[in-house]
Amino acid sequence: MTKDTIERIRKFTEDREWDQFHSPANLAKSIVIEAAELLECFQWSDEEYDLQHVKEELADVMVYCQNLLDKLGLDADEIINMKMTQNEV
């Protein structure tokens, strides 16, 4: 995710004063809820789906992930690379 996109997410959240609701637990729950909505896109068929709806739900998941990263003071590249290194062992 680009720095501009990350800043846009932060501004969107700040403008709405949503940070007060963004505890790590609430954000983790929101990620799961949005992931379930993404899964619904494929509920009745593995081959037929609405790509626009998939993009929207995937974006929702990613926005909540970025919010959780911010709340925990983490960097996506850093933790993904750490996990990839662990997985390569």
Predicted features by range, described:
Residues 1-89:
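Flexible "arm" and connector segments at domain edges
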